[in-house]
Amino acid sequence: MSSPLASLSKTRKVPLPSEPMNPGRRGIRIYGDEDEVDMLSDGCGSEEKISVPSCYGGIGAPVSRQVPASHDSELMAFMTRKLWDLEQQVKAQTDEILSKDQKIAALEDLVQTLRPHPAEATLQRQEELETMCVQLQRQVREMERFLSDYGLQWVGEPMDQEDSESKTVSEHGERDWMTAKKFWKPGDSLAPPEVDFDRLLASLQDLSELVVEGDTQVTPVPGGARLRTLEPIPLKLYRNGIMMFDGPFQPFYDPSTQRCLRDILDGFFPSELQRLYPNGVPFKVSDLRNQVYLEDGLDPFPGEGRVVGRQLMHKALDRVEEHPGSRMTAEKFLNRLPKFVIRQGEVIDIRGPIRDTLQNCCPLPARIQEIVVETPTLAAERERSQESPNTPAPPLSMLRIKSENGEQAFLLMMQPDNTIGDVRALLAQARVMDASAFEIFSTFPPTLYQDDTLTLQAAGLVPKAALLLRARRAPKSSLKFSPGPCPGPGPGPSPGPGPGPSPGPGPGPSPCPGPSPSPQ
């Protein structure tokens, strides 16, 4: 048994509480979200700590108690579901990141492929400039050669006469070299693509109404002047130009034609007619806007054709009797002169005053009568132009055949596969005569068309040709024999003035025992 002093030296060990507890109550620990992971790691053997009152100093000692298993299973299911959702979200984001990385890599490769290297871009630009320079040099050489064909030479303009617009700077800070010099602008000389035909016709009608009907005008003539009634000027309006009087044709792109149209549309008479008609003149308009005037660039030969390399079996006396005096007639002289000449925007009549002067000294022959022969090709072409005017015309052969006396000219529209016999039959029908009574020939080259089965294409009469007619001639080698007595000895009779042998005088046997020939 120990002494009291020994017991005083011993101290009693009191356990320290883990957390402050209210005296007289048991402490219950409340779990939050941060403790859910710790609870899962503890397993099913988790305990709930409860503080109970102690017999020493009122300090409660913790007491362990078993937690029910149903609460742990619900918590486990909740955490498993939440973990599954997080894993799925992480997987989807990972796949999206991988897809975007692949797209970025592909776009970077494409950018590297399309991005030209500086050296390659400079080389390509240099090749383009060299090609353009070669092309421009070739065009300059062609234009200089074209000008030299007409005896012209390009002079150009000095650099100090540039437009003020050439000194402007573009938005990129570079000078526009295309405006550094004055270049020809096609729009300054070309007509607008569209012409208001309705407005033009209305303006011409208004101008014609300004002239009093039956008005007269003093016209100078050789030896004085006379009053003439104003006759309407024929004006044909085509799709590509106009034609006043009998020509020449004035296309819309010609500057003089543009000035004429501008005067008409502004309500004035054309300035080129001011000298001939100072007080105005009415117009007789032919609306042919649906037709295109074909500009072949060559005027028809106004003179008389000549045959080269053909021998004429005529005597000199016959030629003198056939062509007495000068071969130049008044009509031929007028045909060599132009009808009208445009000088400084004015139409000058050439043939009119000269015709009036020659009319007093020598009568002018009648003009050649042109007769259009109605052919199947002409009827078909007329029907085609009415039904479908925009379709291109088929290849045709236009024949101009002059009669024997030169007073008539027959115009025939034929197909290239038609024959000479078809032409002969149509001419015989138009002239109301036998087809065998005339011959068809050409002067250059001198050709006589006798084969009626020969086509126009094979004869070289496409697309147009000028032919002549003449009376059919008998063969030159044909001889007619007439019965008669054979000449005896002595001087032989002369058969006639024509060529042929003439037996000379002297005895001898009869030259022909039968009938004597006499040339036709």
Swiss-Prot record:
Every UBX domain range: 392-469
CDD domains hit by this protein: UBX_UBXN11
Lineage, broadest ranks: Eukaryota, Metazoa, Chordata, Craniata, Vertebrata
GO MF term set: ubiquitin binding
GO biological process assignments: proteasome-mediated ubiquitin-dependent protein catabolic process
Start-end of each Sequence repeat: 487-494, 495-502, 503-510
Domain SEP stretches: 230-294
Name of the protein: UBX domain-containing protein 11
Region (Disordered), start-end ranges: 1-26, 476-520
